[in-house]
Amino acid sequence: MVCMHETTSERFDFRTAMEGYAKAGIRAVEPSLVKVREFAQKESAAAARRLLDDLGLKAMSSSNQVGLPEPGDARARSLEDLKWKCELAQAIGCDRIVAPSAGTGQYTEDDYKRGADNLREAADIARPFGVRIMLEFTRTSRFAASLPTALRLVREANHSNVRVMMDTYHFWAGISKFEDLDLLRDGELHHLHFEDVPADPPREILGQPNRVFPGEGITPLGRIVEVLKRKRYAGAASLEMFNPAIQAMDPYQAAVRARAAIEPLIR
């Protein structure tokens, strides 16, 4: 199932993005909780849920909360923000939130023991809302930049509300290896961000805006999908783009383009 991550339409408000996605035949979305809050402050969280329901949209995931796994001075603030985000996620019928690792410190092995504890603490906050914390490894993180490390942290946390997710951009442009997919247990992957890595610029200077639509780059997305299906992943493929030109594209047009790019790869 093709899913639209609201970051792909960053220049638009919640209603405009959701209406454009629905018009394009999208049924799965990954709302930005900041955008949902802006909408709710003018109307209500219940109105946001009604909008999704009326459009035939399901919030498959929500975005996001940084600063949860790695030790750091900002963690207390991250945990406070997590509370309102989980409450809002629950209000729009969403049962999961992305927790990217964006650590920039110099970490030790003991920090990874604390990382598992940190994920458990975050999950205890999320559990009363029926929300799961999904650890996302990111290519620039100094703490969790690869699938093996993310799996280690999630497994050591050993909490029913802590799961692992993957972004194909971070996977292929980062330090993970294709063979790392074999480490996944059946049904272990909880969510998927689905984009391509361009041949240029060199990976050493790649940035988030360099992401391209699936099929336009060098990532072996077809092979990745084959492995994930074998690993019993049956969730959505969510397009998360940071290119300012794409973020300014009419949400309907962005969603039409997403479907054309992704659907042939995930059939």
Regions found by a protein language model. Give the residues of each.
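Active-site-proximal loop/turn and secondary-structure-junction residues that shape catalytic pockets
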Residues: 8-10, 33-35, 65-68, 101-105, ...
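Active-site acidic/histidine proton-transfer and metal-coordination neighborhood
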Residues: 15-16, 51-55, 70-164, 173
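Histidine-acidic metal/acid-base catalytic patches
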Residues: 1-25, 56, 93, 144-166, ...
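N-terminal-biased segments
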Residues: 1-13, 21, 32-34, 38-45, ...
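Conserved beta-strand positions in the central sheet of alpha/beta enzyme cores
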Residues: 30, 61-63, 98, 134, ...
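Glycine-rich, proline-tolerant flexible connector loops at the mouths of alpha/beta enzymes
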Residues: 30-52, 101-107
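Short, solvent-exposed loop/turn segments at secondary-structure boundaries
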Residues: 40-43, 71-76, 108-113, 175-178, ...
